[in-house]
Amino acid sequence: MTEALRRVWAKDLDARALYELLKLRVEVFVVEQACPYPELDGRDLLAETRHFWLETPDGEVTCTLRLMEEHAGGEKVFRIGRLCTKRDARGQGHSNRLLCAALAEVGDYPCRIDAQAYLTAMYAQHGFVRDGDEFLDDGIPHVPMLRPGSGQVERP
């Protein structure tokens, strides 16, 4: 079955779609990973937030990510977060498909992600490099990573 790729600005997100995205994120991050944290962080409906997801013909969300535009120090940068895939849909390239779609939109701008440590190799395949020390977020090791924009100096 081929999932449709959806991309929607926060302001255009309908209630059903938002519910399905949040439901999947809670399934993965809160239940599966046993991290009782507030998934609703206030950023899903910000004007500069875009949501990407894959959806089956019957409307089931199988994979999602959130792309946010930030302006750190006056510089436009993007941040990818909340990338997750439904347990029974893993291993089929869905995360890579969403990452490619989001990064196509990012274009030549820098993009950041706080990657779960075991996923750093996957993000490296998309041009991300380590950009700081490993840290714990809700008990899970994470690594800050950066995909430099054009003209940016890559870090080792």
Swiss-Prot record:
InterPro entries reported in the protein's UniProt record: Acyl_CoA_acyltransferase, GNAT_dom
Q: Where is the N-acetyltransferase domain?
A: 8-150
Q: Transmembrane ranges?
A: none
Q: Name one GO molecular function term.
A: acyltransferase activity, transferring groups other than amino-acyl groups
Q: Read off the Pfam families from this record.
A: Acetyltransf_10
Highest taxon, organism lineage: Bacteria
Q: Give the protein family.
A: Belongs to the UPF0039 (ElaA) family.
User: Any idea what this protein is called?
Assistant: UPF0039 protein Mb2876c
